[in-house]
Design a protein with these regions (language model features):
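Short aromatic/hydrophobic "clamp" motif used to bind/position activated sugar donors
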Residues: 83
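Glycine-rich, basic loop-to-helix element that forms the pyrophosphate-binding segment
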Residues: 61-78, 99
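Short, acidic, metal-binding catalytic loop of nucleotide-sugar glycosyltransferases
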Residues: 24-33
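Conserved donor NDP-sugar-binding/catalytic core segment of glycosyltransferases
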Residues: 94-127
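Short, flexible, basic/aromatic active-site loop/helix in glycosyltransferases
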Residues: 115, 130-147
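A short, conserved alpha-helix in the catalytic core of glycosyltransferases
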Residues: 149-157, 161-166, 171-199
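Non-catalytic, C-terminal membrane-associated alpha-helical segments of glycosyltransferases
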Residues: 216-217, 230-291
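A conserved acidic beta->alpha catalytic loop
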Residues: 25, 39-48, 90-93
Length: 291
């Protein structure tokens, strides 16, 4: 079966009940994919619960929280050609992995399939679905709209492409980390295509702090500018965040600015401009989204 070629990788930290629910759904999938859980240093008995209730799951234990970078450890452990990336509060719809693998098999230069995400008990469409579906980028021979973004819980990637691009950045940890990976895949010639028939269900954990997540996203947007974008863009984004923090005196923007500046030396040491064609695509998307 095609679906034996995909491993589901889940990163988690201190969300034992939600993770167990997710693993119940994943274990019941008709595709029966191998599952790797990477535990980001949980202290709530997560590892013991996985061992007891899901002995078939491969468990990777990290000593501390590495954020989204932890997924890289799971991808390295995978022995399949493709990897399906999941959160501890999301799961794939039956048949979704079969469809994703078939698309990747039929398009050998495709690096990643971005799926569609349905949120909560009501299956509300995530707003990103419409954004990806309306991408203005030229599609070419791809099986769906060509995009430069995806949700981390709704992606099926070619394992070799994921690893060649460096996976998820350790510097960014969490909060918009998919953006940098999408850019780096494109820079290596591995496009991403959106497929509305590859469906994920996401029930966001109540333990998520929306203000903290917003600060992380703002911080990482600035850092990505310094990591990959032209100098003028990086300066403009940093200036915007500094002005917002000074004007609003909001703890969210202030924290984002402080963390961005703290991590700026590390970002500069990793700075690598994107190919002109990828930068042009990013600018096209930015102009389209601003319209």
């Amino acid at each position: 079966m095609l679906t034996t070629q995909v491993t589901v990788v889940v990163a988690t930290r201190n969300r034992r009940p939600g993770l167990c629910r997710t693993l119940e759904y994943l274990a019941a999938l008709p595709e029966r994919p191998p599952i790797v859980v990477v535990d980001n240093g949980s202290t709530d008995g997560t590892a013991d619960a996985v061992r007891e209730k899901f002995p078939q799951v491969e468990l990777v234990l990290l000593r501390r929280n590495l954020g989204a970078h932890a997924r890289n450890y799971g991808v390295h452990r995978a022995r399949t050609r493709y990897v399906a990336l999941s959160d501890d509060d999301s799961w794939w719809e039956p048949g979704a992995l079969t469809r994703a693998v078939r698309v990747l098999e039929d398009h050998p230069r495709l690096g990643l399939v971005a799926g569609t995400t349905l949120v909560g008990e009501e299956d509300d469409p995530d707003p990103l679905n419409a954004v990806l579906a309306a991408s203005p980028l030229t599609r070419g021979a791809l099986p769906g709209p060509r995009v430069l973004g995806f949700l981390g819980c709704a992606a099926v990637a070619r394992r070799d492409a994921f690893l060649a691009a460096g996976g998820y950045s350790r510097l960014l940890r969490i909060g918009g980390e998919e953006e940098l990976l999408a850019y780096d895949l494109a820079a290596l010639g591995w496009p991403i295509s959106y497929r509305p028939d590859v469906v994920v269900h996401h029930w966001p954990s109540a333990a998520r702090d929306p203000r903290r997540r917003r600060a992380q996203e703002l911080r990482n947007h600035v850092l990505i500018g310094w990591l990959r974008r032209p100098l003028a863009h990086a300066l403009a984004e940093t200036g915007w965040l500094a002005a917002a923090a000074r004007r609003d005196r909001d703890p969210v923007t202030s924290r984002a600015l402080a963390e961005a500046l703290l991590n700026l030396p590390r970002a500069l040491s990793r700075r690598r401009l994107l190919p002109p064609s990828v930068e042009a695509d990013i600018q096209l998307l930015e102009h389209s989204n601003a319209a």
